[in-house]
Amino acid sequence: MSDLKKGLYIISTPIGNLEDITFRAINILKSVDFIICENPKHSLKLLNKFGIKKKLYSLHDYNEKLLIKRIEKSQNTSIVALICDAGSPLISDPGFKLVQNYIDKDLFITSIPGPTSLVPALQLSGCPMDSFAFFGFPPKSNKSIKLLVNKIVNIGLTSL
């Protein structure tokens, strides 16, 4: 896949079984210049399984702006992958500022679909799937949890 465009590839990764990754995702990961991930130690399990050796940059909420500055000079000339520890990046994960940075600079960006926990959770729930709301991880404080529960109860949609 050496004909990849320079830009950002948001790549879904397996949730539990490493073999759930797509062939396309593996080929792109083999072709990128570097990979932005949450936890390099965790990501290496996947990458090593498929013989992928790339420079890894760790991304967290606290270092996202710094990471953007760090890669800024190479954004126009690099093929970059964004992965998370499990599933689809950006769903309850850091990275939206990075994506917004690429959008603001009118740089190429695409999503490589794959494993996600949302659809299986909906499928196995037995609830209607035509309309639903996703709330991510629950808050930590009891007060915030109560507010969220009230919001979910009153929304009238299948809620995750």
Regions found by a protein language model. Name each.
Residues 48-53, 72, 95-96:
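Glycine-rich loop at the start of a catalytic domain that most often binds anionic cofactors/ligands
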Residues 2-6, 119-160:
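Beta-strand/loop-alpha-helix module characteristic of Rossmann-like adenine-cofactor folds
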Residues 26-27, 72-73, 96-100, 150:
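Alpha-helical segments flanking ligand/cofactor-binding loops in enzyme cores
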Residues 29-35, 107-110, 158-159:
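Short active-site oxyanion
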Residues 57-65, 137-142:
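Conserved helicase motor
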Residues 76-135:
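Short glycine-cluster motifs
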Residues 1-62:
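Glycine-rich, flexible N-terminal cofactor/catalytic loop recognition
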Residues 68-76, 153:
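Short amphipathic alpha-helix with an adjacent loop that forms part of the alpha/beta core around
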